[in-house]
């Protein structure tokens, strides 16, 4: 049985953690990717290893050991990016985790006392994953006093919290006895939406077309035109203001980004009143719904793929136009539910609820975008199925997080391109593609867990299956396969940019043209194809009564069978 590593003896005795900051042992073995150095402040303790680090974003330490042939080696030690389950432990109790190398097992621990990640007393046998580790080191007499003080402090804190709750209930009761309205909690915001936003009497609600965690999307009409209304409850005003701020950025107008019309307040009833985003409505619904219901020939599939890449390239681009600065933006929640189909069959990217403004190189001096608070906010992402491997295993490059988030979007884009091409009959010898499946649905089913996705996409490095018949149709036999593989590469730095993706797709759309390849794009990227000028037929204008009354059209639910909140199709009655 392994004994203690004895790392405590290597720590300088002069390091003392301030009472409000956690101090941990810091060490990273040579060759380890994804440094956690930015999660804390390295203390100047000389050149000896390991060093000490003072945590910036949590009060939790971690340690990772590699057990090979009954011999343990330290892989990483440092601060966690947030307080996670297990951080309440006073000692380092390692638990096993699979290792990609045969004959090796990783052991990890989280703990919440100073330098607690420096040592462990016992590692569980590698052949019994899930076996809890043995108890940590016995507490010294001084530690017993410290633990008693901690328990006393927690008791006093609980008592104070209980008193605050009782006081709030008494105040609420007094308001009711005196007949005064109970004051509602006001969200912490620089702008009071209830005062700033005006109601639109001509806005009417028809039918719910999608429900999310922070908002409900309605089909409706504004001044005789069909619109989508994203209604937020008052408790989600922070999400409303974040998404509104992005839509109101100068220069964000693009054919393949859902068009923002206005912000308002109201609802289908007085009791449901809250902040609203009024957006362009696309009656054909989401990409998921469309692919479930229809197949698309080679030209239509390339049209959807190219327009999707153009929209993402525009979001990612930092540019000046007509004296206005548009920053680069990472979407962070690309999925076939958040991409809509326009009347001309092209795509429009929607749902900027998790989108993030990226640091730029040419931004004006007065430009002060809201920066994310800590690594946890940077690595926040949307639909798990479309999350890049570096987000699943939390190894995103925090040194250059702007570029890292762009690369994570490219991975999601590759999965959407695969979904589009999987419904193209021209890529099948019998012209009969199989029923639509989401990315990884064939491998993991409808509701994969994060652990299942991590094992498949990170540990095994598997990707959705590309049929060999795709090579038989395209003018460039390996073009489709190379495009997808260059977008969902396990190495984020090896992935294409969104601009290069649209140039590759343009070459597939117009193979007869001569395309010079710029040197800046890996494996060559042809220039952009000309903009498509296909006109969009105007939607039918239907009569509408004032706000909170039903509109004279109905929404036919067109289920995307893989999602409980499907996209919908509008149809006049």
UniProtKB/Swiss-Prot annotation:
Intracellular or extracellular location(s): Membrane
Transmembrane intervals: 150-170
Residue intervals annotated with topology Cytoplasmic: 171-573
Record: active site: 333 (proton acceptor)
A Pfam family reported for this protein in Swiss-Prot or TrEMBL: Pkinase
Signal peptide extent: 1-17
UniProt enzyme class: transferase
Glycosylation sites: 66, 119
EC number(s) given by UniProt: 2.7.11.30
Record bears the keyword Cell membrane: no
Membrane topology summary: Single-pass type I membrane protein
Domain Protein kinase positions: 203-518
Positions with a binding annotation for ATP: 209-217, 230
Extracellular topological domain: 18-149
CC annotations in GO: plasma membrane; receptor complex
Annotated CDD domains: STKc_BMPR2_AMHR2, TFP_LU_ECD_AMHR2
Pathological condition linked to this protein in its record: Persistent Muellerian duct syndrome 2: A form of male pseudohermaphroditism characterized by a failure of Muellerian duct regression in otherwise normal males.
Similarity comment text for this entry: Belongs to the protein kinase superfamily. TKL Ser/Thr protein kinase family. TGFB receptor subfamily.
Role of this protein: On ligand binding, forms a receptor complex consisting of two type II and two type I transmembrane serine/threonine kinases. Type II receptors phosphorylate and activate type I receptors which autophosphorylate, then bind and activate SMAD transcriptional regulators. Receptor for anti-Muellerian hormone.
Assembly and binders: Interacts with type I receptor ACVR1.
Name of protein: Anti-Muellerian hormone type-2 receptor
Native source species: Homo sapiens
Gene: AMHR2
């Amino acid at each position: 049985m392994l004994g203690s590593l004895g790392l405590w003896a290597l720590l300088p005795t002069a390091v003392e953690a301030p009472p409000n900051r956690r101090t941990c042992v810091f060490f990273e073995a040579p060759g380890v990717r994804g440094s956690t150095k930015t999660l804390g402040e390295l203390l100047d303790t000389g050149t000896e290893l390991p060093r000490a680090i003072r945590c910036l974003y949590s009060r939790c330490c971690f340690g990772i050991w590699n057990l090979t042939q009954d011999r343990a080696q330290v892989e990483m030690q440092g601060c966690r990016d947030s307080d996670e389950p297990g951080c309440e432990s006073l000692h380092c109790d390692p638990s096993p985790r699979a290792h990609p190398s045969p004959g090796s097992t990783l052991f990890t621990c989280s703990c919440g006392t100073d330098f607690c990640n420096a040592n462990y007393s016992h590692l569980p046998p590698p052949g019994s994953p899930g076996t809890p580790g043995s108890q940590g080191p016995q507490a010294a007499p001084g530690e017993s006093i410290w633990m008693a003080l901690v328990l006393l402090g927690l008791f006093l804190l609980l008592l104070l919290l209980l008193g605050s709750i009782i006081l709030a209930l008494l105040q609420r009761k007094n308001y009711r006895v005196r007949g005064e309205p109970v004051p509602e909690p006001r969200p912490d915001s620089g702008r009071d939406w209830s005062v700033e936003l005006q109601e639109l009497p001509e806005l009417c609600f028809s039918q719910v077309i999608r429900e999310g965690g922070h908002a409900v999307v309605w089909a409706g009409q504004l001044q005789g035109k069909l619109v989508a209304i994203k209604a937020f409850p008052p408790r989600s005003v922070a999400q409303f203001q974040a998404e509104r701020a992005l839509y109101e950025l100068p220069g964000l107008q693009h054919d393949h980004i859902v068009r923002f019309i206005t912000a308002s307040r109201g609802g289908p009833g007085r009791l449901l009143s809250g902040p609203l985003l009024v957006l362009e409505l696309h009656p054909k619904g989401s990409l998921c719904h469309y692919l479930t219901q229809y197949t698309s020939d080679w030209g239509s599939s390339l049209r959807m793929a190219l327009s999707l890449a153009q929209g993402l390239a525009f979001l990612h681009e930092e540019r000046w136009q007509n004296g206005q600065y548009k920053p680069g933006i990472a979407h962070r929640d690309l999925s076939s539910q958040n991409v809509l189909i326009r009347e001309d069959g092209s795509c429009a990217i929607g749902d900027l609820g998790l989108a993030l403004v990226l640091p730029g190189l040419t931004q004006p001096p007065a430009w002060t975008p809201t920066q994310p608070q800590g690594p946890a906010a940077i690595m926040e992402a949307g639909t798990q199925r479309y999350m890049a491997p570096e987000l699943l295993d939390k190894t995103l490059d925090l040194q250059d997080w702007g570029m890292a988030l762009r690369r994570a979007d490219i991975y999601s884009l590759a999965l959407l391109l695969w979904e589009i091409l999987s419904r193209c009959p021209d890529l099948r010898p019998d012209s009969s593609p199989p029923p639509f499946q989401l990315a990884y649905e064939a491998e993991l089913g409808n509701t994969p867990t994060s652990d299942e996705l991590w094992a498949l996409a990170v540990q095994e490095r598997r990707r959705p299956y590309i049929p060999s018949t795709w090579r038989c149709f395209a003018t460039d036999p390996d073009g489709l396969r190379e495009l997808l593989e260059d977008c969902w590469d396990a190495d984020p730095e090896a992935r294409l940019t969104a601009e290069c993706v649209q140039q590759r797709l343009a070459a597939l759309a117009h193979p007869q043209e001569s395309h010079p390849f710029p040197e800046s794009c890996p494996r060559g990227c042809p220039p952009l194809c000309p903009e498509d000028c296909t006109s969009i037929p105007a939607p039918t204008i239907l009569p509408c009564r004032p706000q909170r009354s039903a509109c004279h059209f109905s929404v036919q639910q067109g289920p995307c069978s893989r999602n409980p909140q499907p996209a919908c199709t509008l149809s006049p009655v």
